Amino acid sequence: MLAAMFGGHALFTISDKTFDRMVEANNGRTGYHIHVSEGMNDVYDSLQNYGRRPIQRLQDHGILGDKTILGHCIHVNTAEMEIIQHTNTMVVNNPESNMGNAIGICPVIQLHKRGILLGMGTDAYTNDMLESIKVALCSQRSQNCLPNVGWCEVTDMLFRNNAKIGEKYFPATLGVLKAGAAADIIVMDYKPFTPFSDENIDCLLYTSPSP
């Protein structure tokens, strides 16, 4: 299966004129992928040069929508979250990249509460998505100063929402093992020291080393 998006880098490298040309060239055929508010420099640049916060600027140019993916969204305020929510725009969290670059933590809990479709990404920082679960969980608990939050949101991002995002571009059912769905299988060298069941899957994912 092949599908395409219209990729832009980040707001601080794209002028208003370029945004308008992107929308004209795309002509509504697909969504956009762009890094947004990954660091505070993105916010400062947008305010200084365009007088608008990043999400507001994207809305002004018609970039947002239900097939657009915003990477990172670390430094977004309440008004920007509302815009993302009302335009049904998607957000992809890249926890290891964000922590490695020391640029902040995506407000996953707050975005999730608004019903925003959140996916799990890597921004090419790692190829170990199970390790990303642990990093995302620890970062959310640290950010919110609560040791009992984040698990449902983080696992949903990887195991449910990534498939939902993919289904917006590919004409197939993804992320499930059933007749008619696209093959979506990984093979792991599992050594059954303990039973593997739906009753202890949370513990196994959180405490086991990645394959």
Please identify what each model-predicted range represents.
Residues M1-M90, N101-L118:
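Histidine/acidic residue-rich metal-binding segments in metalloenzymes
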Residues D16-K17, Y44-D45, G104, E131-I133, ...:
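Short, well-ordered secondary-structure micro-motifs
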Residues E38, P95-G100, D123-Y125:
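Short, acidic/turn-prone active-site loops that include or flank metal/cofactor-
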Residues N41-D42, G100-N101, N127-D128, F196:
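Short secondary-structure capping/turn micro-motifs that flank functional sites
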Residues D60-I63, K67, P107-P192:
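His/Asp/Glu-enriched, well-ordered alpha-helical/loop segment
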Residues I69-L70, P95-M99, I165:
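Short, flexible loop segments at the rims of nucleotide/cofactor-binding pockets, characterized by
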Residues T194-L205:
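Short, surface-exposed loop/helix-turn segments at secondary-structure junctions
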Residues Y206-P211:
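Conserved small/polar residues in nucleotide/adenosyl-binding loops
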